[in-house]
Structures are given as structure tokens and as C-alpha cells.
Curated annotation (Swiss-Prot):
Protein name in UniProt: DNA primase large subunit PriL
Free-text comment on the cofactor: Binds 1 [4Fe-4S] cluster.
Source organism, top-level taxon: Archaea
Taxonomic classification: Archaea, Methanobacteriati, Thermoplasmatota, Thermoplasmata, Thermoplasmatales
Quaternary structure, from the entry: Heterodimer of a small subunit (PriS) and a large subunit (PriL).
Length: 340
């Protein structure tokens, strides 16, 4: 089972050895060295996440470490979100399969969360004890009234929960751990460290592009799946508001990435007070790479916030730990319209 270990994940020499080890004819019956096996499993996990394969894929610590460096080197928001969600679900499954309480305690400890099964137990279904602050932080990200603090037994600063609730809390803490750890690795450092597998990285990127483009084209046009930021920009444009350059760039690049053609994008800007169709078409061609040679990607959520273009309000999906990009929101909604 996975036991999160930030020190191991950030061990560049370990990661370099995993990346550099070549297939050997000895040591394993299948002809793979241990490091090569780790590398193979890590790439397979990321690719399965990219392709939307929701089958349970158990992974170990070293594989998880290499997966993080793959994500850092790729630096693709949707690939990162999908992979971490798949890892989250894998962790939850493993937590539900543990045979010893101590394993959950150790898992929580690795994430800085104190869990106890030795304290007073209130009711046969409430086996685990966790601090109120930790519970409130992570349980708030789980959908369902069952996981609300108001529906738990609370005593003297601790919450008493059953195994199901605890697994959900720990999986969300794991998501935070993954993003926090990933943020400590610079893309340039990741590329240099695992440069011997750049071809494999490109294969993952190509798999993503193919799968992503098919899904986007199939689902384009359903604006109900757009994130709140894009809906707000569209609403302002329709009302004749003079939307900022960054807002227009964000919308045009979002629509392009969502599979919209130039002719389909132009109408969104017709009510802008300074609308000029020739200029608008030129800018769309520039954003799409037809003129510039560089295809623009819409800004990340962090950039949208810093430019006062984030309108998440109470949208629960926007508040998910892994939600870092408007396209990620759209992709997730495409797969499951009811998700919150």
C-alpha cells in the first residue's frame, strides 16, 4: 500500500536512477530490472488516467514518486488532475483494504494528521478519532451530507467517524499532499532529471492530445458545462460590457481548446462595444496558432484570480483541491455532468 513519503518523492538521485535504468536480461523473470519495472508501471498509470480508465491500478511508493516527476515534466493541467484523481481513488481503495488499524494511523501521520483508534469509542460504527480542524479541512471537499461536520459525533475537540468517512478524509488529505509536493518541483528540473525518458513523455502527451481532442469535439457547444469564469465573461460580453483584454483572450483560447471553430467563436464577441469582425478574426487566428505558430492555452485558475476574472462563488467543483484550470473543469463536467 502507498505510504506517502515526500522525502522519497523529492529524491532526485532515486528518480534519475529509475529513469536511466535500461532493460536487463537478469534479475527478474520478465527481464526487467526493479527500476525499469517501476518506470514502466508509473507510465502505465499516467496513461490509463489520461485515457479515462477507471479500473483499479495498485501502485507502490516508488512508482508514486516517479509519477509525480512525470507530471512535473509534462506540466499539463488536465493530465495532472486526472492522474491525481486516479491516484486518490487508488489510495481510497487501498485504505479500505487495510487489515490493521495501525496502517491508517501511519498513513495519516505521513500527511500530518493524527488518527487514533485507541481512544474512547462512541458507538460501534465510530472507530476512528480525528481532530476537528483536520476533519473540517478535508471532509468539506467530499460531496454528501454524511461527511458534514454537523452530522458527526464531536467531543472535546475530536470527531469520531467510521471507516468510510475516514477513508474519504484521508484521500482528500492525500490530494493536498500530492499538489503540495508537485509544487516543489520545477518543470525544468523535472525535465533534466528524467531526460532519458523524454520520448515516453511525448507518447503520454500525444495520447492525451488524441483522447482530449475527440472528447472536446464530441461535446463542444454545451455551454452549461463551462466553468463559472467563462460563463461570467460570456454574460458580460452579451450585455455589452467592455471586457478586459485578458478576459477576451481567456474566453477565445478556452473556446478554441474546447473545439470551437473561428466562425463559432466570433459571435461571442459581437456585442462588445468595440467589436470589429476583421480584428476579432485576426486575434482568433493568432490565438489558435494559425498566424503566430503558437497555440495559446487559456490562463490557469491562479492567473484568472490575479486578474479578477475568477467567479467561483459557491461552485463546489471550483473549490476542489485539484481544480487548477478552466479546461479541467470543462473536461470533468464532460465526463460527469452531475459532479459537484
Amino acid at each position: 500500500m502507498i505510504l506517502p513519503d515526500r522525502k522519497q518523492i523529492l529524491d532526485r538521485e532515486l528518480i534519475r536512477r529509475i529513469a536511466d535504468t535500461t532493460i536487463s536480461g537478469s534479475g527478474h523473470s520478465d527481464g526487467l530490472s526493479e527500476y525499469a519495472s517501476i518506470r514502466k508501471a508509473a507510465f502505465a498509470f499516467v496513461e490509463s488516467a489520461v485515457l479515462g480508465d477507471q479500473a483499479y491500478s495498485p501502485i507502490e511508493n516508488a512508482e508514486l514518486a516517479f509519477i509525480v516527476w512525470i507530471l512535473a515534466a509534462l506540466d499539463e493541467n488536465i493530465i495532472t488532475a486526472r492522474t491525481i484523481i486516479k491516484a486518490r481513488d487508488t489510495v481510497e481503495k487501498q485504505l479500505r483494504l487495510v487489515e490493521h488499524y495501525e496502517d491508517l494511523e501511519e498513513f495519516g501521520s505521513r500527511l500530518g494528521i493524527e488518527i487514533s483508534v485507541f481512544g474512547e469509542q462512541i458507538g460501534k460504527d465510530h472507530l476512528y478519532r480525528i481532530g476537528v480542524a483536520d476533519f473540517a479541512t478535508y471532509a468539506s471537499r467530499v460531496t454528501g451530507s454524511k461527511y458534514r461536520l454537523s452530522n458527526q459525533i464531536v467531543r472535546e475537540g475530536y470527531v469520531y467517524v467510521d471507516e468510510d468517512v475516514m477513508a474519504k478524509v484521508l484521500r482528500e488529505a492525500f490530494v493536498s499532499f500530492m499538489f503540495d509536493t508537485l509544487d516543489q518541483i520545477r518543470k525544468e528540473d523535472a525535465i533534466e532529471t528524467i531526460k532519458s525518458v523524454l520520448d515516453d513523455l511525448e507518447k503520454i502527451r500525444e495520447s492525451y492530445r488524441k483522447a482530449h481532442n475527440v472528447r472536446m469535439i464530441a461535446g463542444k457547444g454545451d455551454a452549461s458545462m463551462f466553468p463559472p469564469c467563462m460563463k461570467e465573461i460570456i454574460k458580460n460580453l452579451e450585455s455589452g460590457v467592455n471586457v478586459s483584454h485578458m478576459g477576451r483572450l481567456a474566453l477565445a483560447s478556452f473556446l478554441h481548446k474546447a473545439g470551437y471553430s473561428e466562425d463559432e467563436i466570433v459571435p461571442y464577441f459581437r456585442n462588445a462595444p468595440d467589436f470589429d469582425e476583421n480584428i476579432t478574426r485576426y486575434q482568433i487566428k493568432h490565438i489558435s496558432g494559425e498566424i503566430s505558430g503558437t497555440e495559446y492555452t487559456p490562463p490557469k485558475c491562479e492567473t484568472m484570480r490575479s486578474n479578477h476574472l475568477c467567479y467561483m462563488d459557491d461552485d463546489p467543483l471550483c473549490h476542489r483541491e485539484w481544480m487548477k484550470h478552466p479546461l479541467t473543469y470543462y473536461e470533468v463536467k464532460r465526463r460527469n455532468r452531475k459532479i459537484r
